[in-house]
Each structure stands twice: as C-alpha cells, then as structure tokens.
Amino acid sequence: MAYPQGYLYQPSASLALYSCPAYSTSVISGPRTEELGRSSSGSAFAPYAGSTAFTSASPGYNSHLPYSADAAAAATFTSYVSSPYDHTTGMAGSIGYHPYAAPLGSYPYGDPAYRKNATRDATATLKAWLNEHRKNPYPTKGEKIMLAIITKMTLTQVSTWFANARRRLKKENKMTWTPRNRSEDEEEDENIDLEKNDDDEPNKPTDKGDSTDTEADHKLINPGEIPCDRFKDETHSKDLDPPLTDSELKEAEERTDLLAEQAKPTTSSPSVLQRGSDLITQEKPSEPGHAASTGNSNVTSVIHSPPSAPKPKLWSLAEIATSSDRCKGSSEASQAAGLSQSTVIASAASPTRSSPQCPLPNNTVLSRPIYYTSPFYPGYTNYSTFGHLHSSHGTNTSSTAHFNGLSQTVLNRAEALVRESKVRSQTQVDLCKDSPYELKKGMSNI
C-alpha cells in the first residue's frame, strides 16, 4: 500500500493487537517503561519509529487502545489473547522470554528440564530399582514409564540404561537372574542399544543351550552329509516318477525347442532361422544320450530316451503327415524338431484341428517358428494356425494357396530366400558367427 507523503497511517486496534506475539501479553498488561517508547524501532503499536506509545494516558492519535495505561484495564481488554501459561498482570514485562517448554506435553523435546545425560539423582533412582529387582532386572512398560517420569528421562533413555546395566553385570559375572528369551518388548527396547547387541553376539549360543553347539559339532564332523542327503532326495524323487508317454515326450522336446527359440532375436531373417534349425538338429541327437547317461549314473533311466540313430515312431508319423516333395532334401531331425512343436501347440489351441492338417509345412516361408511359441499365442507357431489367412483346413500342402491377402511376388521371393539359406547353412552352421551385415541384407531382400 502506498500512501501520499505526510499521511499518517493508523491501523485498527484489532490489527495492532494481533500483530504482537501470542505469549507477550505482558507487554500490554505489565508496567510500561521508557525504553519501550524510546527504542529505535518503536513498539508493535507505534505508527512510526520512535513514537511515544503508552507513555501517556491521554487518548491521543498515537494511542490505539481506548483505555488508559492502567494495567488492570489493559488486561481486561486483552484477556482473550492471553495464554493460560502466561504470567500474572502484576509481573514485570519481559519481551524476550516466552515460556515455550510448558505446553508441549509430558515429554517436551528440547525442554531444558530434560537433560541429555542422566543426573546422579536419576541414576540413583534407577540403581535402587535394579537392586530391588536383581532376580528379574527387566522392567515392564508401565515400570519404565513410571521411572521415566520420576527421573525426568525419556523412555528410550530408561530402556537403554537398563540394557547397559544388565550387560555390565553380565560382564562382571554378577548375574543373579536366569536369562530369558527376548519378548517383543525387550526386542524393541534392546535394539536401541547398539553396543549391547554387538557385545552379546558371542554369548548368544550359551543362552540358547547346548542344542546349537551339538548341531554345529555334527556339521563340522560330517561336512559331506548334507549334499549326500540332498542327492538321496533327488534320486528318491526320480524313482517315484512314472515312465513318460509319447505325448509327454513330445512336450519335453517342445520345451527344448522353446529354450532355443528364446535365445534368438525376434526380428531375425529367414536365413538365420534356417541356420538355427540346422544347429539345433545337430545338437539334438546328443541330448537324449546325455539324458540317458545322467539317468543311469543315479538310478535306472526313467525317460526311455531313444538312441540317436533310429528315430522313434513319433517322428516318422509327424514326418509322413506333413512332408512334401520340396523338403525331402532336408534332414529328418530338422523336420521333426519344427513339426513336433507345431503339432503340439496346434492341437492345444484347437482340438478339432489335428496335426496332419497343418496347411503350411516346415519348408515354406519360415522354416522355424518365430516370435511366440507358447499356447497363449499359437498363431505364430510355424504359421500353422492362422485361421483368418486360411482358405481351407485340408491337407493341401501348397504354400501359396492359403494366403489370400499376400501377393504372389512376395511369396516367391521368400521361397527363394529359404532356398538360399539352405545352401548357405550347409557351410555356415554357427549362429554366433553371423555378422549384422548379413542380417540386414536378408531383411532388405524381403
């Protein structure tokens, strides 16, 4: 607010009253001094610096109270702003002191009455209680609160003092009580004292008894017992497993294919996918033999794993059902690896659609299933169950008749890429040796 020069701004009486601190009503009610009026900054009721407020009883323009300077009259006017903890009206006015400590509750932090270090009187009280309760020096919550009030200490200080006292007596071999298991209250209280927890760590086994010591001795004497027991449990659980059926064998092979597919990038070119299939077919014959050797080392083999040379009936059935003239040059195992997965997931997705009805066999646009191979998303498995792209669900194996929306040129290009990748995969088997340049080249050709 800007006023013209020479204008005397006089605030109202309510503004002047509320501009003073809440605890300093003694300024109003106490006897006035000349220093207040002559101070360089004036008082809260002065319209300008160095005014003579409250120095005269005349109701002039510079006195904002309608009463005289009488203390009793001013006290009656300002009784509604006075504090119940304030001084009486007869006491001398003191501007700098405000009794903050009293109204803050029973445990006022920062109150000078509560010292940080315990006094002799406080420790004497606590020692007296400890001597009376030497058989059980664990005060309850109520007793701690009572002692805290008497000694003017906080509850934390009392708990810490008793924890330290018990530790001292324990070190001096003056324990006259039986150590007890810590209850919830004791855990709360003794966790405060960090020194006690550190010092008592070596002594804890003696409190718990000899059971932990004997267990530790047994562990030291026979260190190899634990892995042996674990090994026995594993072999026992293997004995209880029933022999697997053909469908379970199929699911086991599907899991190995899933693990191999997760290691690939989701946007790999068909050439990379074909190489991955060839790589997995080379590794796959060694897997059943490895499983058989590990099974025979423990117990008799539960999974009757077929030898690598003769293929079981399962592979040949899937191969005959979905093979075509174009894919006869490829190996049997590569077909079986891809087709067992597609037949399992297709049958899981739609039970009415059997495995011989896969319209796109292993040799078409993509030789391996990409992206998602779980039954939650069966449409991507070998492109075998894309119902919205199929014109019929018969056993026709032509690759281009079932794609209604795709152009013929794109399919021809993709087939040419597959043929290219078959030739290239014979020389390059290792997936890790593919350069990113070849990947980009394969993607750009599509």
From Swiss-Prot:
<dbReference type="InterPro" id="IPR003893">
    <property type="entry name" value="Iroquois_homeo"/>
</dbReference>
<feature type="compositionally biased region" description="Polar residues">
    <location>
        <begin position="264"/>
        <end position="274"/>
    </location>
</feature>
<dbReference type="InterPro" id="IPR017970">
    <property type="entry name" value="Homeobox_CS"/>
</dbReference>
<dbReference type="GO" id="GO:0000981">
    <property type="term" value="F:DNA-binding transcription factor activity, RNA polymerase II-specific"/>
</dbReference>
<feature type="DNA-binding region" description="Homeobox">
    <location>
        <begin position="117"/>
        <end position="173"/>
    </location>
</feature>
<dbReference type="GO" id="GO:0048468">
    <property type="term" value="P:cell development"/>
</dbReference>
<comment type="similarity">
    <text>Belongs to the TALE/IRO homeobox family.</text>
</comment>
<dbReference type="InterPro" id="IPR008422">
    <property type="entry name" value="KN_HD"/>
</dbReference>
<feature type="compositionally biased region" description="Basic and acidic residues">
    <location>
        <begin position="227"/>
        <end position="258"/>
    </location>
</feature>
<dbReference type="GO" id="GO:0072498">
    <property type="term" value="P:embryonic skeletal joint development"/>
</dbReference>
<feature type="compositionally biased region" description="Basic and acidic residues">
    <location>
        <begin position="202"/>
        <end position="220"/>
    </location>
</feature>
<feature type="compositionally biased region" description="Acidic residues">
    <location>
        <begin position="184"/>
        <end position="201"/>
    </location>
</feature>
<comment type="function">
    <text>Transcription factor. Binds to consensus iroquois binding site (IBS) motifs 5'-ACANNTGT-3' or 5'-ACANNNTGT-3' in regulatory elements of target genes. Required, together with irx7, for hyoid joint formation; they act cell autonomously to repress expression of cartilage matrix genes, such as collagen col2a1a, within immature chondrocytes of the joint interzone. May compete with or modify Sox9a activity, thereby reducing Sox9a-mediated activation of col2a1a. Probably acts in the developing hyoid joint downstream of Bmp signaling. In concert with irx6a, plays a role in visual performance.</text>
</comment>
<dbReference type="GO" id="GO:0006357">
    <property type="term" value="P:regulation of transcription by RNA polymerase II"/>
</dbReference>
<protein>
    <recommendedName>
        <fullName>Iroquois homeobox protein 5a</fullName>
    </recommendedName>
</protein>
<dbReference type="Pfam" id="PF05920">
    <property type="entry name" value="Homeobox_KN"/>
</dbReference>
<feature type="compositionally biased region" description="Polar residues">
    <location>
        <begin position="293"/>
        <end position="303"/>
    </location>
</feature>
<dbReference type="GO" id="GO:0005634">
    <property type="term" value="C:nucleus"/>
</dbReference>
<keyword id="KW-0371">Homeobox</keyword>
<dbReference type="GO" id="GO:0032330">
    <property type="term" value="P:regulation of chondrocyte differentiation"/>
</dbReference>
<keyword id="KW-0238">DNA-binding</keyword>
<dbReference type="InterPro" id="IPR001356">
    <property type="entry name" value="HD"/>
</dbReference>
<dbReference type="InterPro" id="IPR009057">
    <property type="entry name" value="Homeodomain-like_sf"/>
</dbReference>
<keyword id="KW-0539">Nucleus</keyword>
<dbReference type="GO" id="GO:0030182">
    <property type="term" value="P:neuron differentiation"/>
</dbReference>
<feature type="region of interest" description="Disordered">
    <location>
        <begin position="175"/>
        <end position="312"/>
    </location>
</feature>
<dbReference type="GO" id="GO:0007601">
    <property type="term" value="P:visual perception"/>
</dbReference>
<dbReference type="GO" id="GO:0000978">
    <property type="term" value="F:RNA polymerase II cis-regulatory region sequence-specific DNA binding"/>
</dbReference>
